[in-house]
Regions:
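Hot-dog-fold acyl-thioester-processing enzymes
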Residues: 1-58, 105-107, 114-198
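HotDog/MaoC-like acyl-thioester-processing domains
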Residues: 2-7, 64-147, 204, 208-210, ...
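Small beta-barrel nucleic-acid-binding modules, principally OB-folds
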Residues: 53-68, 195-207
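Acidic/His-leaning functional-site neighborhoods
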Residues: 159-247
Length: 251
């Protein structure tokens, strides 16, 4: 079995936006599915982990796209493990058309938790470090890893939303992709008629659960470029704890 997994997806029309191209949230979901398929096929996926009360949780995700697949387009998500440490592992993605067209790339960081205590676990203790047998350090992923999203006290409050049944995933907390969708809803349809997302980053800090209210704060990144369309977002739950930060770059 290859170290790099390749999985076919379809840009279904109901997963596409008004322009007929795949939603960023659905692309993120395809990447997470590819990660699950890849890890399960190689013996360290969720199917096995749940038998030992462990689970993968997404810590960081960065996606950079040249363009999004159009509706009805078949494409592959390639994924591979770049490295593995005791508490974190880095997994990369490539989004490739059936004709070889390179749509874009993704980078992610994952942790493993004990599903009872919700505390981090030693990744290398699972099956005597079996993940190390699948590391592919030489395959290129030519996008930045991304860093800490810096925000000042001047970030403006945008809105507060409620969380419900459809926001919750198999781990019992708010789904990683739901945060992506909620962040991208901060801009209206008219904005998206004139701009597209070139790069999206999100870092998950703390869990939120059904019933929590999530408050969104946003500011334009100050990088001395007046033409820059990069925005930073902070999400805070009911008790004031920050859940995650996101950076969105438009062109």
């Amino acid at each position: 079995m290859d170290k790099v997994g390749k999985y076919e997806f379809l840009a279904e029309p109901f997963h596409c936006d008004f322009s007929g191209r795949l939603f960023m949230g659905h692309l993120g979901n395809h990447m997470l599915n590819a990660a699950d398929f890849h890890s399960t096929d190689r013996g360290f996926g969720m199917k096995y982990l749940m038998t030992i009360k462990r689970s993968w949780v997404l810590s960081r995700l960065a996606i950079e796209m040249n363009e999004m697949p159009e509706q009805y387009t078949k494409f592959n998500v390639e994924t591979w493990v770049e490295n593995a440490m005791r508490f974190f592992t880095q997994r990369n993605f490539a989004v490739v058309g059936k004709d070889g067209k390179q749509y874009g790339y993704g980078r992610s960081v994952w942790a493993m938790i004990d599903t009872d205590s919700r505390q981090p676990c030693d990744i290398l203790s699972v099956k005597d470090g079996a993940i190390n047998d699948w590391i592919e350090a030489n395959k290129a992923c030519p996008i930045d890893k991304g860093g800490r999203v810096k925000m000042s006290d001047k970030a403006e409050f945008v809105r507060t939303i409620d969380t419900h049944y459809n926001d919750v995933d198999i781990n019992g907390h708010i789904n990683s992709v739901k945060y992506i969708e909620h962040v991208l809803d901060l801009w209206n349809l008219e904005w998206y008629r004139e701009h597209r997302i070139q790069r999206f980053e999100i870092a998950y800090v703390a869990e939120a659960h059904e019933g929590d209210k999530l408050s969104f704060y946003m500011e334009k990144e100050d990088n001395n470029d007046v033409s820059s369309l990069t925005y930073n977002v902070r999400i805070v739950r009911t008790d004031g704890v920050e859940c995650c930060r996101s950076k969105v770059k438009f062109v």
